[in-house]
Regions:
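Nucleic-acid endo/exonuclease domains
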Residues: 1-196
Length: 196
């Protein structure tokens, strides 16, 4: 079931559901230890993997410089008690650059979302954001660093969950109804929110 990926009510319902389920949610968290500059990871266990992905993004369209900030910008939601970071992804996250990054993740990388479905969405949606011209590579790189946060700052983050917007009509759920809360929990644990 496809739906408008920019439906503001969907995002509001997701947030309301999460606030209903968890007591300790931080909105728009920032992790200062999460640098987006590759050289800051030299000597760490993630450096080789990140270097391979970064190089693949540089080679994708020949754009070499797409990192313009020091650290990751704010994320969507963080549940400190569970050490879970939650990202809600609109269509602009499903690009060829993101597919290039995902295809270069190390074998055995543990995802907390269905990466194969995510790759399929990149192929199908092929979103493009050329303003500025490096934006697709930049977003793909920042998403990559977020995916690696459990390795970068394991004392704060155990997993990163990505919820694709537009794959389910979240706006039809009511956070005040127990049956909808139960349905929301089930959807988050299943793959039915992903386009087949």
């Amino acid at each position: 079931m496809s739906h408008d990926c920019r439906c503001n009510k969907c995002k509001s319902v997701i947030y309301a559901m999460l606030f209903r389920i968890y007591d300790d949610i931080e909105f728009k968290p920032k992790f200062d230890e999460a640098s987006v500059h590759l050289e800051n990871y030299e000597g760490t266990k993630v450096y080789r993997s990140l270097r391979k992905i970064y190089k693949a993004l540089q080679d994708y369209r020949g754009i070499k410089h797409f990192v313009k900030v020091k650290n990751l910008c704010q994320s969507d939601l963080y549940i400190p008690s569970k050490k879970i970071l939650i990202e809600t992804d609109e269509s602009q996250h499903f690009t060829e650059a993101r597919l290039e990054a995902l295809n270069n993740y190390p074998k055995g990388f543990i995802f907390s979302y269905n990466v194969n479905a995510y790759k399929q969405m990149c192929v199908k949606i092929k979103s493009k954001d050329r303003d500025p011209k490096y934006r697709d590579e930049q977003r793909a790189w920042y998403d990559t660093v977020r995916d690696f946060l459990p390795q970068i700052c394991p004392t704060k983050i155990k997993k990163v969950i990505r919820i694709p917007l537009g794959e389910f009509k979240w706006c039809e759920l009511n956070h005040k109804k127990e049956e909808d809360v139960a349905k929301f929990k089930k959807l988050l644990k299943s793959e039915c929110i992903w386009r087949k």
